[in-house]
Amino acid sequence: MLLGINNDPEANHKLVDEISGKAFSWYQRLVSKNFGSSKYILKSIDSNMFEINLQEYNDVVRTNFDLRKNGIVFFFRFKQQEFAESCIYEKITIQSSDRIFVIQTDKNLYKFEIINTKNHLSFIKNLFNFKNNKKLKS
C-alpha cells in the first residue's frame, strides 16, 4: 500500500507497522543479519493513486528496503513529499535482471535501477529467507 506520509505522519507510520510489522532493533538486526538493502534508484511506478510521474522529474529518487517481520517497507521523497510503500511478503513478486529490479506489490509496480550488484544479490537472498521463514511459521 502506497501512503503519503506528510499528511498524517504518526497515523501513516502506525499503519506501516500494522501491515509489515515494527522495525527491528539493532540487536534483532545483528542476530538475524537483517540490515536492509543498499540504495536503489526508483525509475517508475505504475498505477499509483498519487499520479507520481518519474519520467518528467529531473531529480534522482533514491530508496532502500527494510525487511520486517511480516513484509517489506521502503520510503522515498518526490517533490517535497515523503511516501512509504508497505506490503506483506505473500503479495510481493519480484524480477531482477542485470541493472533493473522490479517489485510488484498488492497495488503497484515499481522499477528500480540497481546501483551495487553484489549488495543487490545479498538483499535478494535475505528477502527470500524472510519470505520463506514467514511461510514456515504460518
Regions found by a protein language model. Give the residues of each.
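Generic short beta-strand segments
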Residues: 38-47, 70-77
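Phosphoinositide-binding peripheral membrane targeting modules
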Residues: 56-64, 68-95
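A low-complexity, Ser/Thr/Gly/Pro-enriched, surface-exposed linker/loop concept
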Residues: 40-60
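Acidic, Ser/Thr- and proline-rich intrinsically disordered linker/docking segments
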Residues: 1-45, 91-138
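Glutamate identity and glutamate-enriched acidic tracts
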Residues: 10, 18, 51, 56, ...
